[in-house]
């Protein structure tokens, strides 16, 4: 895990032996499971350390304290939620993943990593956000899903408690995308708080963290039915 350790040193973070072992196990299980179902196109040891593990942990630049209630929307193979949980064991983590096969991997890897305080939710975000058990219950929500910011706002902000934040990793020039998302962010009860540049070893490709703050309750009609936020963003 030399690449990960080096990258974390730039953040002033060091891993203990247990955490190093967990990341090693995570890599081995990811590659093994990926041979049976498609979890990720990134499988080389160095690339996983940088593009999955370090990229996930870079969310600490947004001021994560380590004791939050965090929801990872569209978690896939567990990024960024599980690397953050390894780093901060006190986080109460929800992993929301609609694809059953991926959700099964998340359940299995959570056990193999010896993690507690993790809930796997295998449902669509649009449906889950209307459930009182999850709606406006999280202090932090994140998603690495490849989606327009307007769509992401509708799929993430309804989970945020007022005063909570959404952390959305993005890359490249996002000014136009953020302009398009202004309506969706406002309708969900949010505001753009700040945009943070990510400049870490191996991640010098224009990565950014978009921070949204939840300032009022999301109206009951949002999010709209499954698939609509992606097909017809609120712009």
Curated annotation (Swiss-Prot):
It is found in: Cytoplasm. The keyword Iron-sulfur does not apply. Keywords: Cytoplasm, Methyltransferase, rRNA processing, S-adenosyl-L-methionine, Transferase. Its EC number is 2.1.1.-. It comes from the Bacteria. InterPro entries: rRNA_ssu_MeTfrase_G, SAM-dependent_MTases_sf. S-adenosyl-L-methionine binds at residues 74, 79, 97-99, 125-126, 144. Belongs to the methyltransferase superfamily. RNA methyltransferase RsmG family. Specifically methylates the N7 position of a guanine in 16S rRNA. This is Ribosomal RNA small subunit methyltransferase G.
């Amino acid at each position: 895990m030399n690449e990960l350790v080096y990258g974390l040193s730039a953040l002033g973070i060091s891993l203990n032996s247990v955490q190093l072992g967990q990341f090693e196990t995570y890599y081995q299980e990811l590659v093994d499971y990926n041979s049976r179902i498609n979890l990720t196109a990134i499988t080389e040891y160095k690339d996983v350390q940088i593009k999955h593990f370090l990229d996930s942990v870079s969310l600490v630049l947004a001021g994560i304290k380590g004791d939050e209630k965090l929801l990872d929307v569209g978690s896939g193979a567990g990024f960024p939620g599980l690397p953050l949980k390894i780093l901060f064991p006190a986080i109460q983590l929800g992993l929301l993943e609609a694809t059953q096969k991926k959700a099964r991997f998340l359940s299995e890897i959570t056990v193999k990593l010896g993690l507690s305080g993790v809930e796997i939710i295998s449902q669509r975000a649009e449906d889950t956000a209307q459930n009182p058990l999850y709606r406006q219950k999280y202090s932090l929500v994140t998603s690495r899903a490849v989606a327009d910011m307007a769509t992401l706002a509708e799929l993430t902000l309804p989970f945020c408690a007022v005063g909570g934040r959404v952390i959305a990793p993005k890359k490249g020039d996002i000014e136009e995308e953020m302009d398009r998302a202004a309506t969706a962010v406002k309708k969900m009860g949010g505001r753009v708080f700040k945009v943070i540049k990510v400049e870490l070893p191996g991640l010098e490709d224009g990565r950014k963290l978009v921070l949204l703050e939840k300032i009022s309750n999301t109206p009951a009609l949002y999010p709209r039915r499954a698939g609509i936020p992606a097909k017809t963003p609120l712009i």
